[in-house]
Amino acid sequence: MTDDPFLEMEATQFTKTGQAACGDDVQLLTIEKENRSLAALSDGLGSGVKALVLANMTTTMALRFMQSNLDLLESVEIIMDSLPVCEVRKISYATFSLFDYHLGGRARIIEMGNPAYVHLRGTEEVAPAKDRTVVSAHWPDREVREVEVDVEPGDRIILCSDGVTQSGLGSGQAAYKFGWRRSGMLAFARRMISSEPDLSAADLARRIACFAKNITPESCKDDISCLVIYFRHPRVLRILTGPPYYKSSPARRTWARITSSSAAARRRTSWSASWAAA
């Protein structure tokens, strides 16, 4: 078995109450020939279909630029210049979190406007190996953070929209006066992993998103998106297949037809060979 980690990348999303579409977008891409995995999570301005259009444009362009290894600042400027301008706020805007990993190397995370990523090794948070912030001359009010992290089997990286960290804000609950916040999400993820060390990416993403949603169970105040990337050891799957146990099974009858056809084909082949020899 290879020592290289296997990546699980899974996301859970909830739509803001009253909206027909989630204003966040998540896209995942695996490039097998490059042993490379990419992910993009974007939160479009506002909510509903318009926000989804902004978010989808952002994730689509971001994945293409990462695939092409385009310069970070140039990529961000193209994305921001391409987004339509909101008629009310007079700004073009979509936040994003991007993930880029080559098998055997460091993982790269790029963020603008979204809550800061979480990197857990077991239940311990891991600091980045490199961390820098860049500012575009075109958009001086936007800061883009780029980090590189060393990863090991068992590590998890969590990306989310502010619908997760701000959940509970304005609900009147004392515990969520300032929302759930990143610290609350981090503590929750640690508890989940502590109780189930092999918890899958899909289950952890679902639990985080569901908890954020259920802080105000009567309504979802914002679009909620949580993406979890889990680096784990590959698992070996062995499958033994054969005819069904019960004769009454439709699959058994199918198996019988297949074996009967195979036997008939062998007889025809044998007869043809005998005729040719004669």
Positions of the model-derived regions?
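C-terminal catalytic subdomain
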Residues: Q166-A251, A277-A278
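Regulatory cytosolic signal-relay segments
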Residues: M1-C22
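Active-site beta-strand/loop microenvironment that shapes enzyme catalytic pockets
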Residues: P250-W275
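Short, hydrophobic/aliphatic alpha-helical segments
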Residues: L29-L41, V149, R206-C210, Y245-I258
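Primarily the active-site beta-strand->alpha-helix module of PP2C/PPM metal-dependent phosphatases
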Residues: D25-M80, I158, G170-L186
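Acidic loop->beta-strand submotif enriched in PP2C/PPM serine/threonine phosphatases
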Residues: Q19-E34, P128-G170
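Catalytic core of PPM/PP2C metal-dependent serine/threonine phosphatase domains
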Residues: L52-T123, V144, L199-I229
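Conserved beta-strand-loop-short alpha-helix elements that form
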Residues: N35-S47, E111, D150-Q173, I229, ...
